[in-house]
Curated annotation (Swiss-Prot):
This is Inner capsid protein VP2. Inner capsid protein that self-assembles to form an icosahedral capsid with a T=2 symmetry, which consists of 120 copies of VP2, with channels at each of its five-fold vertices. This capsid constitutes the innermost concentric layer of the viral mature particle. It encapsidates the polymerase VP1, the capping enzyme VP3 and the genomic dsRNA, thereby defining the core. It comes from Rotavirus X (isolate RVX/Human/Bangladesh/NADRV-B219/2002/GXP[X]) (RV ADRV-N). InterPro entries: Rotavirus_VP2. Belongs to the rotavirus VP2 family. One of its GO terms (molecular function) is RNA binding. Disulfide bonds: none annotated. Signal peptide: none annotated. Its main location: virion. GO terms for cellular component: T=2 icosahedral viral capsid; viral inner capsid; viral nucleocapsid. It is found in: Virion. Homodecamer; each decamer is made up of two conformers of VP2, called VP2A and VP2B. Interacts with a VP1-VP3 complex. Interacts with the intermediate capsid protein VP6. Interacts with NSP5. Interacts (via N-terminus) with NSP2.
Length: 973
């Protein structure tokens, strides 16, 4: 291709070139050539080849000290064009697909539909300004890169949080059934054995994985299997449907085909099998009874006790619910502020809502880990940022500042330091400060002052900040308080009153404390004394749980009374500055005397008159969001929980000039609160809390249980491997350093909270049911026995059940034989007693889960090996290395031999496997009962929801002027 050939030629020319002028000439020619090339028509493969050549050329030019910025910019432009072209192509393909489906409106139809409406969503966000994570907190607005600040407007989705609700009829039985014939052994050696009447048995397939997964211990296997079973269990305690059919033996009755009962009925209805007559007789009385009045259903099932136990666990430990009707009424009362809320439909008496499931385990983990706490607080702030109504600013303050300069008779022709007095005042600072103040009402934070601290505007802003901010020691650090006081003193008081500038030193860090009794103007002294009171904010709403949400605080400033202490203090302070500057020929280091006095008078009017709208705006937002305080995301103050952890608080950056910018910037009333959005937000938080609680508590419960069973296992590693993060906050747990996470999971209070969770109780109950199922089910065919009896001399084979010819299984432990447990022998306990029994050639019983070596009766090699090991049990079970260590080093396998096929006359294996000295202890096979178990469950539709707002209809009823509850306008011009 022409472009590739051209670039290869240039690369070869560069290798031969040595003069810098020639390099520059080649660079300029290449830029000019690239400008005329249409890169959109180039294939992807060739474009990649071109990029490689360009990189080689650019590296060569840079090594020759040639500035390659124009060439790189040109190449970047071509890449952007190609990207845009690809996006357009994809969108065009999507449009083509949509157009093919005529039933769906196209994107153009939607655009045309809303084009005439005043609020067009397709043109509202035309201006897209680059946003960064949590810029409300951390953007330095004094830097040029972010001089224009636009808050995030996109909705924070709490998807993909989906709550799956399953009713009891979705339960799949874990124990299958099978039909097996009885073996009738022949008493005559010349006659073969025969099959007798069949019987229906419970299988033990659910223990198929016990050999492969129980290598670390049977208890760990139970916990892992219980954790998997918990995820499969239904989480609603009722039935919504039932698979029924006519009883074939009694047309007046019905039978239940759910819960695996259809397979049983198919087996029983084999009328050629006369051995099942008793079961068919009992089946006539099976029936399903539905009580529509009480909404219950009764039906008959024949299930394994393990399945019945799991059903009881799923019903007893179903997900906690709450009645929907009271919550709907609460939502309707909340939304009565400017809205009329009505129910869309009449609610059923069984209509339920997922209960607020707030994880105390997660709260405790946040208390133990500072990074996790801050991550969760930032996530909550970002979620709440879209609720504030802060659209109250003009586009720019330049005109306002120009008017102030003109009124102060500051000449704009001679640019000097005077014009920089208010240079840091801008809308970006106002936005950031307002968001910080609103966040400080709900979250306790530490302040981090940024920006210039040596200008007139910053000093005026600090003077207002000392009135608005909470200056008590619990909410404001002494360092921040000293910085604000010193700035006000040095930039406003010291020059105006002709006093020496304050310099910090040991023992004297605060200018106000140093000079409050130094004979200053009375008005100035009153302000300083008022500031030194260090007044806190007022509590507006008290939290129900300080470990979940902090109290809601608001500035301690009156909304209506202009004679409130704060307004009077600011007014008298500025009057005192003006009065002091009258006697001083040089009242400011950078502003002339006349200009300074006029500037101060303008500032007095602005600060005193426009501070009240700021307070009203803050109260307007906080009052409404504070109403749903108990529905808000996590906002606890770690200082309330542990006084030693104040340093773990989040640090909010506030521009030093932000308060004056805020006072000057508010020009209009805020938008009305959208209660539909706020209540939808409450629903989203409920779902998020539920998903976080399930994720954290499930994985933490498994970690604690596995550690209880085996102290060598790491709780931290199990937790990280099992957790499935639904939110970024839970995902941040995986970023905690390893040693820190280990220390967190060593906290006794956290472990006790985990043991008290719903997840822990469910998993423990399932594990107990699994243990009982193991103890009472035959598991020898799956490779694990309950124990073994070792005889010194071979004994005759037995017959443990009527379904086998012979086997070496015992269903009961023989009496009068010394017993040992595997765990004791592994620890070295009673090992000498075991050796004494062997030396005395006495039989022994080894209790505990024992791995088995299963021999197939049809293979001569396996039978021969089994004959050798089963007739020398001591040599096979005790290893010489065990004698040296005086303990059992590993679990030893013992032989299991089952012959369950009818034998021909004169079977050759009878002579080989005639006797054995090894017997396996196991449970008997479970027969499906003839008479059924009768179950009774609630029976109604799935009336459980995770959203309240979808049952509510919103009607706007706004007054002409936006008002507070006490009837005061937010802003009066």
């Amino acid at each position: 291709m022409e472009v590739i050939e051209k670039l290869e030629t240039i690369r070869e020319t560069l290798n031969d070139t040595k003069d810098k002028k020639d390099f520059q000439k080649i660079h300029d020619e290449l830029v000019q050539y690239l400008d005329g090339v249409d890169s959109l028509t180039i294939d992807d493969d060739k474009w990649n080849e071109i990029l490689k050549l360009f990189k080689t050329i650019i590296i060569k030019l840079k090594s020759s000290t040639i500035k390659t910025t124009p060439l790189e910019n040109e190449l970047l432009q071509h890449e952007k064009k190609r990207t845009v072209k690809e996006v357009e192509k994809v969108e065009e393909d999507i449009k083509t697909d949509v157009t093919n489906d005529t039933s769906k409106p196209t994107l153009m139809d939607k655009v045309l539909q809303v084009s005439n409406q005043p609020n067009n969503p397709y043109s509202a966000d035309v201006l897209q300004i680059r946003t960064i994570l949590s810029k409300t907190l951390f953007v330095d607005t004094d830097s040029e890169a972010y001089s224009l600040y636009v808050p995030e407007s996109q909705k924070l989705d709490v998807s993909p949080i989906t709550i799956e609700l399953t009713t009891i009829e979705k339960y799949q039985p874990k124990v299958n059934i099978l039909k097996q014939a009885v073996i009738v052994p022949s008493q005559n050696p010349l006659l073969a054995d025969t099959y007798g009447a069949p019987e229906i048995l419970f299988s033990t397939d659910f223990f198929d994985d016990i050999t492969s997964n129980s290598s670390e211990g049977l208890q760990l296997y139970f916990f892992d299997k219980a954790y998997k079973l918990k995820k499969e269990l239904p989480n609603l305690p009722f039935l919504s449907s039932l698979d029924k059919d006519v009883n074939p033996l009694n047309p007046l009755n019905s039978v239940c085909k759910s819960f695996g009962q259809e397979k049983y009925y198919d087996m029983v209805m084999d009328r050629t099998d006369r051995g099942l007559d008793a079961r068919r007789a009992a089946m006539q009385f099976d029936n399903v009874i539905v009580d529509a009045q009480n909404r219950t259903v009764q039906f008959n099932v024949r299930m394994h006790p393990f399945d019945l136990q799991l059903l009881r666990i799923s019903q007893q430990f179903a997900e906690p619910m709450q009645d929907l009707a009271p919550v709907v009424r609460e939502y309707m009362m909340l939304g009565a502020d400017g809205y009329v809320l009505t129910q869309k439909i009449r609610l059923d008496r069984d209509q339920q809502l997922i209960a607020n499931r707030r994880s105390v385990v997660f709260d405790r983990m946040c208390e133990l880990s500072g990074p996790l706490y801050r991550s969760r607080i930032i996530h909550s702030m970002r979620m709440m940022s879209k609720l504030w109504r802060t659209n109250v600013f003009r586009t720019s303050l330049e005109d306002e500042i120009t008017k102030i300069y003109a009124a102060a008779e500051v000449s704009m022709i001679s640019i000097d330091a005077t014009t920089s007095a208010l240079s840091t005042i801008n809308i970006a600072s106002a936005e950031q400060t307002l968001n910080a103040l609103l966040n400080m009402s709900f979250f306790r934070c530490e302040l981090d002052l940024i920006g210039s601290q040596s200008s007139f505007g910053a000093a005026m802003s600090a003077m207002i900040a000392l009135m608005i901010l909470p200056t008590d020691q619990e909410n404001m650090d002494d360092e921040v308080f000293d910085v604000l006081c010193n700035l006000v003193y040095n930039e406003l008081i010291a020059w105006a009153a002709d006093r020496p500038v304050f310099v910090r030193r040991a023992g004297a860090t605060n200018a106000f404390r140093q000079f409050v009794n130094a004979g200053l103007n009375r008005d100035i002294t009153n302000y300083m004394r008022f500031v030194l009171l260090r007044r806190p904010w007022l509590p507006l709403y008290n939290s129900r749980d300080v470990r979940r949400n902090a109290h809601v605080l608001v500035p301690n400033v009156d909304l209506a009374n202009i004679n409130d202490q704060v307004y009077v203090a600011i007014n008298s302070f500025l009057n005192g500055i003006i009065e002091a500057s009258r006697r001083n020929p040089n009242p400011n280091k950078t502003i002339s005397a006349n200009s300074f006095r006029k500037l101060m008078k303008n500032m007095r009017d602005i600060c005193v008159n426009r501070l009240m709208p700021v307070i009203r705006l803050i109260r307007y937002n906080v009052e409404r969001i504070g109403m749903i305080l108990h529905m808000l995301p996590y906002s606890a103050d770690i200082f309330d929980i542990n006084r030693n952890l104040r340093d773990e608080r989040l640090r909010i950056k506030i521009p030093m000039s932000g308060f004056l910018s805020l006072v000057m910037g508010i020009t209009k009333a805020p938008d009305a609160f959208d209660w539909s959005q706020i209540l939808n937000f409450a629903d989203d938080v409920r779902k998020m809390d539920y998903a976080e609680a399930i994720s954290i508590e499930d994985s933490a419960s498994v970690a604690i249980m596995r550690n209880d069973a085996n102290r060598a296992t790491s709780k931290k590693e199990i937790f990280i491997s099992e957790v499935r993060p639904p939110t970024p906050t839970v995902a941040s747990i995986q970023k905690i350093p390893s040693a820190t996470l280990t220390a967190i999971f060593s906290d006794r209070q956290l472990i006790n909270l985990i043991r008290d969770t719903h997840s822990f109780r469910v998993i423990r109950e399932i594990a107990v049911a699994l243990q009982a199922a193991f103890d009472n089910s035959p598991t020898s065919q799956h490779g694990v026995g309950k124990g073994a009896v070792l005889h010194p001399v071979p004994q005759n084979f037995g017959r443990s059940s009527q379904f086998v010819r012979r086997d070496n299984i015992l269903l009961q432990r023989p009496a009068g034989i010394q017993q040992f447990t595997i765990e004791d022998l592994k620890q070295g306990r009673y090992f000498q007693g075991l050796m004494a029994q062997i030396r005395a050639r006495q039989p022994i019983i080894v209790n505990g889960p024992i791995p088995l070596r299963i021999s197939d009766a049809a293979e001569i090699e396996q039978v021969t090996l089994a004959f050798l090991t089963m007739n020398s049990p001591y040599d096979a079970y005790i290893d010489p290395r065990d004698l040296k260590q005086q303990k059992l080093l590993t679990d030893r396998e013992v032989d299991l031999f089952i012959d369950q096929s009818p034998a021909r006359p004169n079977d050759e294996f009878d002579n080989v496997m005639a006797r054995t000295s090894v017997f396996i202890i196991d449970a008997p096979r479970a027969i499906v009962p003839i008479n059924p178990q009768r179950l009774n469950f609630p029976y109604h539709d799935i009336m459980v929801t995770d959203s309240v707002t979808k049952f509510i209809e919103f009607t706007v009823a706004l007054t002409p002027d936006l008002q507070l509850f006490n009837g005061l306008l937010v802003f009066e011009q």
